[in-house]
Amino acid sequence: MGRVRTKTVKRASKALIERYYPKLTLDFQTNKRLCDEIATIQSKRLRNKIAGYTTHLMKRIQKGPVRGISFKLQEEERERKDQYVPEVSALDLSRSNGVLNVDNQTSDLVKSLGLKLPLSVINVSAQRDRRYRKRN
């Protein structure tokens, strides 16, 4: 069973990441030295705990966004994703021989919206191929 981290350690780590994200790495020793240079931390033990939790959060950030932490690079990436517009529309009938291939749910949605599009309903299997299954 692991140890519980205090609120002080968590707050300090989040503040470090938000301010100094580009300088931090996935290496504990590097983060420890950076904590020493940047912040005035009372004890060596507290500094090590903060550096360790910072390293842990950096590893989580590599996998995806972490709740409670926002830094400039993450905000820019989120903004870019929100502003994304595909080059070719999925509703472009000239590319698909005048008929859109959709599943049952999409067909019902299009009908409920009152759009008059030529649709071809295709059955979609709920089971994915083994090769593409996510591994935990």
UniProtKB/Swiss-Prot annotation:
GO MF terms, alphabetically ordered: structural constituent of ribosome
SUPFAM superfamilies: Rps17e-like
Family: Belongs to the eukaryotic ribosomal protein eS17 family.
A Pfam family it matches: Ribosomal_S17e
Record-linked HAMAP family: Ribosomal_eS17
Protein name: Small ribosomal subunit protein eS17B
Function according to Swiss-Prot or TrEMBL: Component of the ribosome, a large ribonucleoprotein complex responsible for the synthesis of proteins in the cell. The small ribosomal subunit (SSU) binds messenger RNAs (mRNAs) and translates the encoded message by selecting cognate aminoacyl-transfer RNA (tRNA) molecules. The large subunit (LSU) contains the ribosomal catalytic site termed the peptidyl transferase center (PTC), which catalyzes the formation of peptide bonds, thereby polymerizing the amino acids delivered by tRNAs into a polypeptide chain.
Description of how the protein assembles with itself and partners: Component of the small ribosomal subunit (SSU). Mature yeast ribosomes consist of a small (40S) and a large (60S) subunit. The 40S small subunit contains 1 molecule of ribosomal RNA (18S rRNA) and 33 different proteins (encoded by 57 genes). The large 60S subunit contains 3 rRNA molecules (25S, 5.8S and 5S rRNA) and 46 different proteins (encoded by 81 genes).
One Gene Ontology biological process: ribosomal small subunit assembly
Location of the protein in the cell: Cytoplasm
Keywords for this protein: Cytoplasm, Ribonucleoprotein, Ribosomal protein
GO cellular component: a single term: cytosolic small ribosomal subunit
Disulfide bonds: none
Source species: Saccharomyces cerevisiae (strain ATCC 204508 / S288c) (Baker's yeast)
Additional detail: Present with 30500 molecules/cell in log phase SD medium.
